[in-house]
Amino acid sequence: MASSQVGDMVNGNAEPTRHLAKFPPSLWGDRFTSFTLDKQLWDKYGNEIEVLKEQVRSMVVAGGRKAAEQINLINVLERLGVSYHFEKEIEEQLEQLFAKFEDNEDYDLFTIALHFRIFRQHGYKMSCDVFNKFRDSNGEFKETVSNDVRGMLSLYEATYLKIRGEGFLDEAHAFTIAQLESLVGGPHLSSDLSEQVMHALKQSIHRGFPRLEAKHFISFYEKDAARNETLLRLAKLDFNQLQLSHREELCHIFRWWKELDLISKVPYARDRAVECFFWSTCAYYEPQHSVGRAVLTKIVLLLSVTDDTYDAYGTYDELKLYTNAVQRWDASAMDELPDYMKTLYRALLNVYDEVERDLAKQGRAYGVHHSKEAFKEIVRSYEIEAEWFKEGYVASFEEYMKNALVTSTGRLHTTSCFMGLEADVATTEAFEWILTKPKMVAASGAIGRLVDDVMSNDEEQERGHVATGLDCYMKQHGVSKQEAIVELYKMIENAWRDINEEMLKPTAISMKLLIHVLNLSRISDVVYKYVDGYTHPEIIKDHVISLFEDPIPM
């Protein structure tokens, strides 16, 4: 992804012409430099949370509740963002509920669709046939469905769990979107329900950032006349306590980044410490993953600057030197680099050394080698794109995607994310699984790459950039830009289908690992949905503030 440049000089006196990207600066100044955790408030939250957790745990395991009531309780716990406290109990309940499920029960559309979504989210392959009773003899939706707003909203959310070959869910997706859009703001919806529908159409549950979606749902749930005050109280306390933890972690990361002072030496690069921490918090938000969030943030930051070096600054000759240095991964390779690259290379080696030391204390350093190898692979693929740009070469779409699945960083992000998990979860076998190039990791990478290609195409081509997947597809198939975008979005949807299918039991590896690959995929949907929100951080600024600064009123 090298930007346009003239005069490949490394050691000559003349500075080569560089076509800089002129990325927007950081939005945050010193906003996150200091933060003092209120220990008294933390303890107050924690003490009440422990009491409420036991009350809720008793609710989850209590007998005598109808299946529909139990599945609704599980849904509320998940949407409130507190289900991670009760994972074992919820899995036991779902196993029993799925084994006993009878589709001849007189369930309405809301309840059937809710069962479908919850079961699929947890790896149980419920058949689409459960929706047949809502279709007429011609296969069309019955008129009663169009009048059931809650049912349509539930079905809409369920369609995001589709896998390949489920044409009905594609039809249901298009149908529910059209119906719900026609009802928003109309006289047939209460303002509260209309607000829920509008949010769902903007961001689905399955593809959303769990912590942000929990905060949204809490605001809806507290207006629900049927709300459970214990659940609501626990959700608010849990969100606010975890927000304090995240804010403290962000402060440490932000100060570390300022002290590293890399951006002052490579000012062409995007300064995105806060956004990278936001990214890492999407990968895993739970309190036990604080080390993982720090590790992943640091690696993503270094990758971001490396990407910008290949994409928007380095000359081809400089980039070849840097690629070779990264393959050697040795401080002595620094001597061959221009000064600005020495700074970046030194930071890369030091950060990985620091990460390895931190993880070694917990017996988890074995994943660092895999992360380094993934970083080396990405840099090799960056150089391939730099060569293509230098030669004006437009690859076939297939050739482009083969390389793009590396530069999409799916392997590096997954490996680096696994490094931050508990040793009994992210075992050596988990890292070996990544080396097999599993379908789920490839699909996650494809989503990120193709969405980014569509959203950043105009801006990148304006400044000079290697042909993107959009350009390659247009040239190979002789189609317009809009036609190519339609085809790329079909590929993105198929990649989501693959992710959903890989999460159905029996899974290749533990669901405790796969959920983080899913979370990494969700980042693409949240950050790149309408525009490149990483390059243009004002797009996700409200998300950052909501997650790290604004507590929920108690």
Curated annotation (Swiss-Prot):
CDD domains, sorted: Terpene_cyclase_plant_C1 (cd00684)
Pathway: Secondary metabolite biosynthesis; terpenoid biosynthesis
Residue numbers binding (2E,6E)-farnesyl diphosphate: 270, 307, 311, 449, 452
EC number: 4.2.3.174
Motif segment (DDXXD motif): 307-311
Annotated keywords: Lyase, Magnesium, Metal-binding
Residues that hold Mg(2+) 3 according to the record: 452, 456, 460
KW Heme (keyword) present: no
Residues at which Mg(2+) 1 binds: 307, 311
InterPro entries per the UniProt record, alphabetical: Isoprenoid_synthase_dom_sf (IPR008949), Terpene_cyclase-like_1_C (IPR034741), Terpene_cyclase_plant_C1 (IPR044814), Terpene_synth_N (IPR001906), Terpene_synth_N_sf (IPR036965), Terpene_synthase-like (IPR050148), Terpene_synthase_metal-bd (IPR005630), Terpenoid_cyclase/PrenylTrfase (IPR008930)
Cofactor note: Binds 3 Mg(2+) ions per subunit.
EC class name: lyase
Known cofactor(s): Mg(2+)
Its biological purpose: Sesquiterpene synthase that catalyzes the formation of sesquiterpenes and sesquiterpenoid alcohols. Converts farnesyl diphosphate (FPP) to hedycaryol. Hedycaryol is likely to be one of the terpenes that attract insects for pollination of Camellia brevistyla.
Domain notes: The Asp-Asp-Xaa-Xaa-Asp/Glu (DDXXD/E) motif is important for the catalytic activity, presumably through binding to Mg(2+).
Similarity field: Belongs to the terpene synthase family.
Name of the molecule in the record: Hedycaryol synthase
Originating species: Camellia brevistyla
